[in-house]
Amino acid sequence: MTYAIHESLTLLSQKQDLPEELTFTVVQDLLSGELTPAQIGGLLLGLSLKGETPEEIAAFAQALRGAGLKIKAPAGTLDTCGTGGDRSGTFNISTTAAFVIAGAGVPVAKHGNRFASGRCGSADVLEQLGISLKATPESSERHLQHIGMTFLFAQVYHPAMAKVAAERRELGIRTIFNLLGPLLNPAGAPYQLLGVSSPSLLPKMAKALQILGSKRAVVAVGEDGLDEVTLTGATQAILIDGGEIQPFIIRPEEYGLNLCSLQDLQGGTPAENGQITLRILQGKKGPQRDIVLLNAGTALYAANKAAGIREGIALAAESLDSGKALSILEKLKASA
């Protein structure tokens, strides 16, 4: 038993928080294969029962970043990866928004995986749309540079995550690893729109982003529990702008968007979700388009491309209506 896991389990058994340095060391021990399955399970369960702190989340992310593959990216790159876990069954809103954001001129390094909740993850829907999940780091760099968007498949860039796959599966509960995807972008995207599935995660993830040196980001959760900027009502959000953390509320009707029901936003299989995304990019109007505009507009505000969400929505609408968003998809398909 390493010193770090012994000390960590001792503290967690007393429901005490782990110091950042100790957390970083114990994750390194985990990644180097020095922990037993029982120790890994105890660590993850102990953190979950106690409640993870922003410092613990950031330390996990720092250790995993060090173990993952990286790519070079333009300075203004953004990611729309969220935590998932809202179990709402909606279509792939943030993935669809990624094409719109890229069409508006902000490079998007979309980090994602196969489904973790619901029926369709970002990798599943992009595969249906004809985008290769096997792009090398070199080709992803080229896509970002010349097309303005790439998909970074978590399984390719973070193979170390496989070391805890069995323990996570056997525990059968959400753990700190369910929070880490948005913090592990291989392109080091300095701008983010990060959806979370619970209001309690808002301040935690915002603080973790700040610790990790995020340049500017919006963390959001819909009052309906959606891990997106929702269209069914208000969204609680936090803007992280360097050293500043500022809570605010997003109300769709203030931007001329009609409220809808969750049923209006339902997705289905990867094939069905792919068709929804394609129809939106081809110009179909309605609530599905509107929630994509709202999320893309918020992301453009987070990336400093727009002075506010209203201007961001206008830029997003222009990206769709001009065909630029659809063109991003077509170029990525052609490069597969």
From Swiss-Prot:
Pathway: Amino-acid biosynthesis; L-tryptophan biosynthesis; L-tryptophan from chorismate: step 2/5. The keyword Transmembrane does not apply. Binds 2 magnesium ions per monomer. It comes from the Bacteria. Its cofactor is Mg(2+). Anthranilate 2 binds at residue 168. Transmembrane segments: none annotated. Mg(2+) 1 binds at residues 94, 228. GO terms for cellular component: cytosol. Anthranilate 1 binds at residues 82, 113. PANTHER family: ANTHRANILATE PHOSPHORIBOSYLTRANSFERASE. Catalyzes the transfer of the phosphoribosyl group of 5-phosphorylribose-1-pyrophosphate (PRPP) to anthranilate to yield N-(5'-phosphoribosyl)-anthranilate (PRA). This is Anthranilate phosphoribosyltransferase. It comes from Desulfitobacterium hafniense (strain Y51). The lineage of its organism: Bacteria, Bacillati, Bacillota, Clostridia, Eubacteriales.
